[in-house]
Amino acid sequence: MTPLTVPLNEAARPLDRLADFPAIPEGWAYLDTAATAQKPQTVIDAITRAYDTTYATVHRGVYQRSADMTLAYEAARRRVAGFIGAASPDECVFVRGATEGINLVAQCWAETQLKAGDRILLSQLEHHSNIVPWQLAAERVGAAIDVVPLTPDHAIDLDDMAAMLTPAHKLVALAHVSNVTGAVLDARRAAELAHGVGAKLLLDGCQAVPRLPVDVAALGCDFYVFSAHKLYGPTGIGVLWGRGELLEAMPPYQGGGAMIDKVSFAGTTYAAPPARFEAGTPHIVGVLGLHAAIDYVDAIGLEAIHAHEGALVREAREALSGLNSVRLFGPADSAGIVSFMVKGVHPHDVGTILDEGRVAIRAGHHCAQPLMDHLGIPATARASFGVYNGPRDVAALVKGIERVTRIFG
C-alpha cells in the first residue's frame, strides 16, 4: 500500500465546516470535491470585496489603487510560496490551472530540452492533462513515452518504476494523489529514482494540495502544479512551481504584455520569471481568491483535514465493502477519494439515482481513460470528501447505494 504522507490523527477527526459554505443547502451531500471544491464564505467575500471596493489593474498603473492591488497580488504570490515551501516567490507562476501549468512545462521545458530518442515516464493512473501534453511534446521532438504499471491496489508501483528507468529518461510526470483511486505517491522516493538517472520530476498536485501538507523542497521534485478551484478557491487560476534555475532557462510560453523586458522591431528581450510566463492581464481577483483559500485551509490545518477525510474514507469503504454488489478500487488509505462500481449497474445510473436522493458524486472515466482500460471497465462512481462533509454524508451515500441495488436487483 502507498504510505500516507502524514499519519492519521484521530484527535483531529471531528471536523465539519458545512456552515462555512453557503452553496451547500441543508440535506444535500456534496461528494464531488475531487472535481471541484465548494467555496467558503471567506473566499466569496474576498472576491466580492475586490470587485466592489479595491479593483484595479496590476503592474501597470501609477495611481494608488493600482499600486495597492499590485501589492495584494504579489502578497498572494508570497503566500503561495510559503504554503508549498518554495524557496522564492519568483518560482511560483500563476497559470489558468494545473492543465496549463503542465502544458507550459511540456512546451517550454520538454520541447527545448528533449531530443529524438529521449524518453518520458508516466503512469497508468494519470489524468489526461498529465498525458496528452507529453504526447504532443514527444511527437514534436521524437521522444518516446513509457508507462509505469500499478500495484494490485491501484497505486503507482515504484519498484517497477525503479526497474524501468534508464539514462534515456529525461522526465517523469506523476500524480501526487490519484484523482480516481486517491492513492498517495511516495513522492520523495519517486524524486530520488528520477534524479538517479538524471531525469526531472513533475508532480500533478491537484488532489494533494487540498488534502496533504506539501513542501516542494522536502519532496525533491522539479516542477509542481495545482489548481485553486480544488483548494476551495476560484476557477481559472492555478500555480506552476518550478526550480528557479529551470524556469530561468525556459523560453516564454506566450507573447504579450507583462512578459517583456524591451520590445523593438529589431528584437525583443524578455522579463525574468515568473513574469516571463504571465503574458497579458492576469486573473487578478482569482489570485486574491486563491490567497483567501490558502488562508482558510491553513486556519483549519492540513493535518486536521487529512485526518478528517481519512476517517470518512474508512467509514465509507467499510460500509460499502459490506454490500455484496459493490466493488471498490484503490488503496484503503486513499486520500479523500472512494471509487467504486455497483455490479450490473452503469456508474451513470448510480450517479443519477444518488442525485434523486440529494447525493452528488462523479460518474465516468474521470479523465483517466487509460486507467479505465487497465481496470477493464468503462467508468467508476466516485465519492470524494471535503471539510464540509461528515458521517451523515457517508450514511446518505450508503443509503443511496442500497436503493440502487434494490432498483436494479
Which ranges hold each PLM region?
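Pyridoxal 5′-phosphate
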Residues: 1-409
